[in-house]
A protein has these predicted regions:
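Positively charged n-region of N-terminal signal peptides that target proteins for export
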Residues: 1-5
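Bacterial N-terminal signal peptides
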Residues: 6-16
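Predominantly soluble domains enriched in secretory-pathway, periplasmic, or organellar proteins
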Residues: 17-337
């Protein structure tokens, strides 16, 4: 069982083959077929790092901001935005050399956490300390900010509609999920979804909202417009993140207490396999948090925050291929090709 100390650090088909954790013990071994770069927010070291995926090496690390958490890359992949959870800004860095190009102030006690860089070019971020969501229009230009209250405690992670008209948030303290209208400013709609809902992901077609509730050991399929729960799916223990494969065929939860991943068929809502990353015996030592698919859906990256590593997992086999550097307590992840 993961200790309260480790948990507090997280706040501020049948199986075709048995899941394995084989390999992956060597840090930064080369992967000739891997391309692009992985960006890692070091929330304990207050850093931002760039990892070259071909070599598996960290090619640059810079000072970022206080307690940085989630990351998002721009549509053109030239910039990466960082939510400064220990402060009140969203900071933007060049993906080429990690130079800071902008710092957008969201106001006193903002504590931004979840962040989305939308295909429309705008940024969206939760401001947990203000119980709100910010829409940042033209972040690399005038950076106009518009604030929308959630009225909920612990507004932590978010998803944004393809048309940019609505956002959805998980609110840890209130045990709710909220639907926020980003145009008309009508009162947000909030419903309770399990215990401590944290992970959230909207399907590409906007038809299904996925939520993982870490205190319920479950994932939920919701109607995005009514917030009605369509299906509850039992997962591994403490699923604090959920993501959907770019192909849309599987949803995956990051299970902190198991040191593993639950793979859910999005069509049936059934768990079809479980992938062991570090396993229950190393779960506390590793403290597995954020998960992120490669753009082609072939690999999934798993932040092991207390170990300062990022596990690279082959999605088809469930094999841990290698462990990449996750300097400074790596948590938030972003990727470019």
């Amino acid at each position: 069982m993961v200790s309260r100390f480790a948990l507090l650090l997280t706040l501020p088909l049948a199986v075709a083959c048995a899941p394995v954790a084989g390999g992956g013990d060597a840090l930064s071994s080369p992967a000739p077929d891997a391309e692009g770069a992985l960006f890692v927010a070091g929330k304990f070291g207050n850093t931002l790092s760039k990892v070259d995926l071909a070599s598996g090496e960290a090619v640059k690390t810079v000072d970022s901001c206080a307690n940085p958490h989630e990351l998002a890359t721009s549509p053109d992949e030239k910039h990466v935005a960082l939510a400064c959870y220990g402060g009140q800004t969203v900071d933007i860095f060049s993906t080429a050399d990690l130079s800071r190009v902008a710092s957008i102030d969201l106001g006193e006690n903002a504590r931004p956490h979840g962040i989305v860089w939308h295909a429309n070019g705008d940024l969206y971020a939760t401001a947990e300390g203000r119980k709100s969501v910010f829409w940042i229009r033209d972040p690399l230009g005038e950076a106009e900010t518009f604030e929308f209250g959630s009225g909920q405690e612990g507004t932590h992670m978010l998803a944004v509609a393809p048309d940019g008209l609505h956002a959805w948030t998980t609110n840890l303290g209130s045990r709710t999920v909220s639907l926020i209208d980003l145009k008309t400013r009508r009162a947000p709609q909030s419903v309770e979804v399990g215990e401590e809902p944290e992970g959230i992901w909207l399907s590409d077609d906007g038809d299904t909202l996925w939520v993982s509730a870490r205190g319920s050991n479950a994932a939920f399929k919701l109607d995005p417009q009514t917030l009605e729960v369509r299906q509850r799916i039992e997962t591994g223990n403490f699923p604090l993140r959920i993501t959907v494969r770019p192909q849309g065929d599987y949803a995956v939860t990051s299970n902190l207490s198991d040191g593993g991943l639950s793979v859910i068929d999005t069509a049936t809502g059934k768990v079809v396999r479980n992938i062991r990353v570090s396993g229950p015996d190393q779960a506390e030592a590793k403290t597995q948090l954020t998960i992120l698919f490669s753009p082609n859906g072939e690999r999934i990256y798993v932040a092991e925050t207390m170990a300062n590593t990022i596990a690279e997992v082959d999605f088809a086999s469930g094999r841990v291929l290698r462990r990449l550097p996750g300097t400074g307590g790596g948590d938030g992840l972003a990727i470019i090709e």
